[in-house]
């Protein structure tokens, strides 16, 4: 790939996390670009594919688009892909209070990364990672979205309480990025 791979995001924290997880041996040059994409509704896979194709048209080249869901089991998967708006209106405290009337506090964090070569005739490829856990009252720093209220299974710290290095070993984003890295190193010629 002679052109750089554009990671479409305006979220500096997300970019920093992805670059850290990819490490120095990723075979493509990753650059970020903020692109005004439509906010779509639907299933996460469909949203990612459509956003990725639109981003590839705008950038006129290879792109990555990432979308994150936080699915509460008690609410049938909501907020799901709409977590951004729930978080903007409610904050981490409000997210945890959404489950006040339910015994089931379990949730799944899902990261879906979509890749397009830039060719509109080629399929978009998806890489998805999931981490299960539960929603708790916010603990830890408030610098990265809903991290303060997500407690991954098997841990006694929320994402926000963990050192970045620990979170980056187990997170939903890490699982998706590792699948992306494998695809790029094994399937594509760089």
UniProtKB/Swiss-Prot annotation:
Q: Which GO terms describe its cellular component?
A: cytoplasm
Q: How is the cofactor bound?
A: Binds 1 divalent metal cation per subunit; can use either Mg(2+) or Mn(2+).
Indicate the quaternary assembly: Homodimer.
Amino-acid positions noted as binding ITP in the UniProt annotation, renumbered to this chain: 9-14, 51, 67-68, 84, 144-147, 167, 172-173
**In the Enzyme Commission scheme, what number(s) does this protein have?**
3.6.1.66
Single biological process term from Gene Ontology: deoxyribonucleoside triphosphate catabolic process
Q: Which GO terms describe its molecular function?
A: dITP diphosphatase activity; ITP diphosphatase activity; metal ion binding; nucleotide binding; XTP diphosphatase activity
Record keywords: Magnesium included? yes
Q: Which domain of life is it from?
A: Eukaryota
Q: Matching NCBIfam families, A to Z?
A: RdgB/HAM1 family non-canonical purine NTP pyrophosphatase
Residues of the signal peptide: none
Q: Record's family?
A: Belongs to the HAM1 NTPase family.
Q: What is this protein called?
A: Inosine triphosphate pyrophosphatase
Described purpose of this protein according to its UniProt entry: Pyrophosphatase that hydrolyzes non-canonical purine nucleotides such as inosine triphosphate (ITP), deoxyinosine triphosphate (dITP) or xanthosine 5'-triphosphate (XTP) to their respective monophosphate derivatives. The enzyme does not distinguish between the deoxy- and ribose forms. Probably excludes non-canonical purines from RNA and DNA precursor pools, thus preventing their incorporation into RNA and DNA and avoiding chromosomal lesions.
Q: Where does Mg(2+) bind?
A: 39
Q: What cofactor does this chain's UniProt record say it requires?
A: Mg(2+); Mn(2+)
């Amino acid at each position: 790939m002679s052109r750089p791979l554009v990671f479409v995001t305006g979220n500096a924290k997300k970019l920093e996390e992805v670059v850290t997880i990819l490490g120095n041996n990723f075979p493509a040059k990753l650059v970020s670009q903020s692109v005004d994409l439509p906010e779509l509704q639907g299933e996460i896979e469909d949203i990612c594919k459509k956003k990725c194709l639109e981003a590839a048209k705008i950038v006129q080249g290879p792109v990555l688009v990432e979308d994150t869901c936080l699915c509460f089991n008690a609410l049938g998967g909501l907020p799901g892909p709409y977590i951004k708006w729930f978080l903007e209106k409610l904050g981490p405290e409000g997210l945890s209070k959404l489950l006040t009337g339910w015994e089931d506090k379990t949730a799944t964090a899902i990261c879906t990364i979509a890749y397009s070569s830039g060719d509109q005739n080629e399929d978009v490829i998806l890489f998805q990672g999931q981490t299960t856990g539960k929603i708790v009252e916010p603990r830890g720093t408030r610098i990265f979205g809903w991290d303060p209220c997500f407690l991954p299974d098997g841990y006694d710290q929320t994402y926000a309480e963990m050192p970045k290095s620990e979170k980056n070993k187990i997170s939903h984003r890490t699982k998706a990025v590792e699948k992306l890295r494998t695809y790029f190193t094994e399937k594509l010629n760089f």
